[in-house]
UniProtKB/Swiss-Prot annotation:
One of its GO terms (cellular component) is cytoplasm. Belongs to the methyltransferase superfamily. RsmH family. The lineage of its organism: Bacteria, Thermotogati, Thermotogota, Thermotogae, Thermotogales. It catalyses: cytidine(1402) in 16S rRNA + S-adenosyl-L-methionine = N(4)-methylcytidine(1402) in 16S rRNA + S-adenosyl-L-homocysteine + H(+). This is Ribosomal RNA small subunit methyltransferase H. One of its GO terms (biological process) is rRNA base methylation. GO terms for molecular function: rRNA (cytosine-N4-)-methyltransferase activity. It is found in: Cytoplasm. S-adenosyl-L-methionine binds at residues 36-38, 55, 82, 103, 110. HAMAP family: 16SrRNA_methyltr_H (MF_01007). The keyword Translocase does not apply. SUPFAM superfamilies: Putative methyltransferase TM0872, insert domain, S-adenosyl-L-methionine-dependent methyltransferases. InterPro entries: RsmH (IPR002903), SAM-dep_MeTrfase_MraW_recog (IPR023397), SAM-dependent_MTases_sf (IPR029063). The gene is rsmH. Its EC number is 2.1.1.199.
Length: 299
């Protein structure tokens, strides 16, 4: 496992437990178990519930296993994409669960651990894979895709509305790109100096987000899973999703709104408290939405 020393702080734990309402004898599916922070909080809050935790990142799963070892009789961890959660449950002989949790985005380990390529703060290989067994890396995408396709990805997935074409052009001009700082350099060269000064966040944030989403098929996977999530829940079971940018939040909002089997519990997304943001700045962009599976034949 790569070197890593920073503690992961799960986001909006109080709100997750409030909306998920875990109870004894109930089964919770943690679709993005990550380093195990939310699962641990749920298990501590509910001494009789059980967690099935899944993640595509084998490295964070090892961290979760260590963090949750005292609950080993009530937690089962699997290296599986949440889009395949229905097949996993079937394999385990579980027809439905009582709660589903999704904490989308990048974990602290993925950002701060060495050589994952998610960060623009230091030089690392251009990887960005959450599943290290996947063949598609950021380096492959940036060096092989046509300029027009790169511009589309940066425009759509990074919401880089004004400068996507300029950034894509600089990426192509700077090929081959091998490290995260190579990508930062290309973005810096593409943006006017006034735009770099104007931005509140790092000027390469949107481009890094776009490439990461594309490499990991994040939006496609989210859409695919949410379509079937309602059928994985027992009546009265709840789904709680924390997203970190508007693209994810829009998918969650529209899926909940269009479902005939879910009752929306959060008319507007719940945001973290000011106190939590002070203690954990990563929580700032978090948006939580929740819904409940209605009874069969219910309104």
């Amino acid at each position: 496992m790569r070197k890593y020393s920073q503690r992961h702080i799960p986001v909006m734990v109080r709100e997750v437990i409030e909306f998920l309402k875990p109870e004894d004898e109930k089964i919770i599916l943690d679709c993005t178990v990550g380093e195990g922070g939310h699962s641990r909080a749920i298990l501590e809050h509910c001494p009789g519930c059980r967690i099935i935790g899944i993640d595509v990142d084998s490295e964070v799963l090892r961290i979760a296993e260590e963090k949750l070892k005292e609950f080993s009789d009530r937690v089962s961890l699997f290296k599986v994409s949440y889009r395949e959660a229905d097949f996993l449950l079937k394999t385990l002989g579980i027809e439905k669960v009582d709660g589903i949790l999704m904490d989308l985005g990048v974990s602290t380990y993925q950002l701060k651990g060495e050589n994952r390529g998610f960060t623009f703060e230091r030089e690392e290989p251009l990887d960005m894979r959450m599943d290290l067994e996947s063949e598609v890396t950021a380096q492959k995408v940036l060096n092989e895709l046509p300029e027009e396709e790169l511009a589309r990805i940066i425009f759509e997935y990074g919401e880089e509305k004004r400068f996507a074409r300029r950034i894509a052009r600089k990426i192509v001009e700077n090929r081959p790109l091998n490290t995260t700082l190579d990508l930062v350099k290309a973005v810096r060269e593409a943006l006017p100096s006034y735009e770099i000064r104007r931005r509140k966040r790092h000027f390469a944030t949107k481009t890094f987000q776009a490439i990461r989403i594309y490499v990991n098929r994040e939006l496609e996977n989210l859409k695919e899973f949410l379509k079937k999530a309602e059928d994985l829940l027992n009546p009265g079971g709840r789904i709680v999703v924390i997203s970190f940018h508007s693209l994810e939040d829009r998918i969650v909002k529209e899926t909940f709104r269009n479902s005939k089997k879910l009752r929306i519990l959060t008319e507007k997304p719940v945001r973290p408290s000011e106190e939590e943001i002070r203690e954990n700045p990563r929580a700032r962009s978090g948006r939580l939405r929740a819904a409940e599976r209605i009874e069969e034949g219910g309104d």
